[in-house]
């Protein structure tokens, strides 16, 4: 296992491991751009399996002021080296009073599901780009994605984590969505 970047070990979110890539160059398909295929390597198609909450049409979701502030903060600070989505999203959440812990992005989903500042909803993965600002999207781990992925929707079809990119809609694993209350 690689040690990651200096200064990342020992913190709640650091752990010394790059999130989403495991330290292996090219292992993280979301570095440098969103995956566009079916996940490759026999990975399952993206789905809402494992998500709880009602199914919703993201076009009908009213955003919140708190969600807009969270998205603005995440976008302003999305300047990481790549591969550290959980660290950067965790820092943005922490600045807004929400703490998540663990070594991998997918671990944030169960914590957000229990947090009173969020409500979980089911959203068709192809519609994730329509989410309001501040929605947190958590992709599960799977083949080629040992840590999963987490991001904060910016409300314009883009997401922020350690980088700003088009909202990922096909990661090859199941997805859970959390809306700020």
What are these model-predicted stretches?
Residues 1, 59, 132-133:
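Intrinsically disordered, low-complexity regions enriched in Ser/Pro/Gly/Gln/His and often acidic
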Residues 1-35:
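Membrane- and interface-active hydrophobic/amphipathic segments that mediate membrane binding, fusion
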Residues 2, 62-63, 140:
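Structured catalytic/translocation cores of nucleotide/phosphate-coupled proteins
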Residues 3, 11, 15, 29, ...:
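Hydrophobic transmembrane signal anchors and adjacent membrane-proximal interface regions, especially
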Residues 27-109, 113:
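N-terminal capping segments
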Residues 94-95, 119, 165, 176:
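Arginine residue identity/basic-tract feature
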Residues 101-171:
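...with weaker cross-activation on analogous glycine-rich loops/strands in unrelated enzymes
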